[in-house]
Amino acid sequence: MYYKQYGDTDMKVSAVGLGTMRYDEEDVKAGRLEKCAEIPLYAFEKGINYWDTAPAYCHDKSEIITGIALSQVKRSDVYVTSKVNLGTLNEDASRDNFRRRLETSLDRLKTDYIDFYHMWCMLNLESWEKHMELLYGFFEEAKSEGLIRNIVFSSHMQGNDIEKVVETGKFKGMLIGYNALNYQFRQSGIRKAYENGMGVVVMNP
């Protein structure tokens, strides 16, 4: 496996990561989560050390499955992500609700910290500005306590809007949809992130 430095951090992540949005539908519905956890463990055997998960993925079971797998490897050998936004908080942007959401993710993942915690699914600048106003301070607090190691964001915005987010210097990295069909709408944002020493992870390749 080829490993790359994540932005200006000291973290070396696998060039191919593991997305955990979908597992076998029948296994999930039947509660065969240990069987599902064989997938991230197999990925780990092949050198994949970046596991991406989130609340609500896979009928709200993805973090649990990831935690089952994570408990069977050395924690420092894997970089784990999760995510939060106003939707997962049911539009309740209180500190207590944010903390409950984060602690639920930590409990499910069977870990005491998350390597990359995403401000999740920023669709446009208006959405991003609202999340920055209401939630960013909670991210900073959690980071200062060691509950999360890096504040990052995921987005489906176009490149010029991504550039504006990057230029704030508030994030260590981003998760962005990027492929042969949409590259022209995202390229400038990715270039700006690289110039600013941010890590870039691609989804929907």
Regions found by a protein language model. Give the residues of each.
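N-terminal binding-site loop/beta-alpha segment at the start of enzyme catalytic domains
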Residues: 1-78
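Short, acidic/polar
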Residues: 28-44, 91-110, 156-166
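Acidic (Asp/Glu)-rich catalytic clusters
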Residues: 7-12, 45, 67-77, 103-112, ...
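Alpha-helix-loop-beta-strand connector modules within alpha/beta enzyme cores
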Residues: 63-83, 133-146, 201-202
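Active-site groove signature of glycoside hydrolases
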Residues: 106-126
